[in-house]
Amino acid sequence: MLRYYGATRNLPLVFSINKLMLRASSFTRPFHYSSYSLQNGDTPDKGSTNKNEIRTPNNAVWKENIELQWQHLKKKLNELYSRFNFHRDQLSFQVNKAKKSIQEANRKLSEQENEINDSRLNYNKDELTSAKIEGLPSEREQHRKKWSRKLEFYFDSLQETLFTATRALNDVTGYSGIQKLKSSISLMEKKLEATKKEHKLFKAQYANAIDERAQSQREVNELLQRQSAWSSSDLERFTQLYKNDALNARQEQELKNKVKEIESKEEQLNDDLYRAILTRYHEEQIWSDKIRRTSTWGTFILMGMNIFLFIVLQLLLEPWKRKRLVGSFEDKVKSALNEYAKEQNMKMDKLLPGKSSEVTDQGNTENSIVEEHIEQRGECKINTAEIDRPEVATAETTTTEMKSFRDIWERIKALFVTLKSIQYRKLDAPLVFDTLEFYLYSISLVSMTILVSGLI
């Protein structure tokens, strides 16, 4: 905090450096001096009339950050839009190409039909036997059906479309770039082989130039040793050797520079080839990882679809199918038993007309058999429930009061009778489930399948 007294000494003003604001502790009139001068330690001039130096909130940093974020977002949106346009153009190109291939197939089919109907192309007379030539390809094509010929042309166009679709898939997955990299590697290998051959050639020429110059220098040295006994031919030879030595030196220097240039070029090609091969294997590894990841997600999606279909079949279709089969079976059994009862009643009426009442009672018993057959499943469930609850029964018997030994004996006998009446099922007997038990069994089976597939 800095304290400064304004126009009147009795009005102290408190200046906060952290908030960069002026706050009057007690005032009767506003303060007209600049906070900037107070921040820099300058004393304001009391006679100054500048009232526009009050510091406003600075939003430059905020605006700069917003502009940076907006520029980054705008760049991302432009890249996304350009990528979308590229894929849209590729898709439209493939669709137009497929349309053109279909139109080309239709055009070929119409041309074939016009050729069949053209009289100039229907000459089929054999000059040796004056008979008709049979088995011509056009005649065979004429006997074929139109849809078969159209299908053949469509398959021909479809083959090209499949190749184009494969190329488009490679473009989407990025394998086209890897193929271009492979072709560039093969070209670089060819260039490297040519450069090596050229290097060997220039190196041999450089060695020959060195030998020629050394030989000419030896001849010059021999001539200089017998300079006192030179003849006119020796003088001409010396002059010629001197000129050739200069030419050989120039040629040797040129060949030396070429050999150095070829060596640097060969080293550069070797480095580029090495880097290209490393890049190729790296990109192929990335591509294979992407394809493997995509196949993994595809497998998960297919597994999810299979689980969904299994749940739908087991929880919706199978109960409906079972209910329908049971209902139709019960209806058939009822109708068969009713017909059998009617036939028996008619026979008994014919044999014993006086005992019709007994026959009607027998018919009622037959109808009760049908009802007992329908309620058989419910009894089985009750029996299984009684098997599962022996502890409850024993608990109830133990909680009751035992007044005498006779009462205890009667209760034990009743317990044995109850246990004897329980119908135990064999191991190979079919299981009987109600709807809730079947749903619980299906859900547990599906959860175990998901758990096992996740562990694998």
Curated annotation (Swiss-Prot):
Q: Which residues form a coiled coil?
A: 71-128, 178-277
- Where it mainly occurs, coarsely classed, is mitochondrion
Output the GO biological process annotations, alphabetical, semicolon-separated.
Answer: inner mitochondrial membrane organization; mitochondrion organization
* Residue intervals on the Mitochondrial matrix side: 31-296
Could you confirm whether the keyword tRNA processing appears in this record? no
Q: What does this protein do?
A: Required for the maintenance of the structure of the mitochondrial inner membrane. Involved in mitochondrial morphology. Causes growth arrest when highly overexpressed.
Transit peptide location on this chain: 1-30
**Keyword match Transmembrane:** yes
What is the name of the protein in this document? Sensitive to high expression protein 9, mitochondrial
The organism's lineage is:
Eukaryota, Fungi, Dikarya, Ascomycota, Saccharomycotina
Q: Which gene encodes it?
A: SHE9
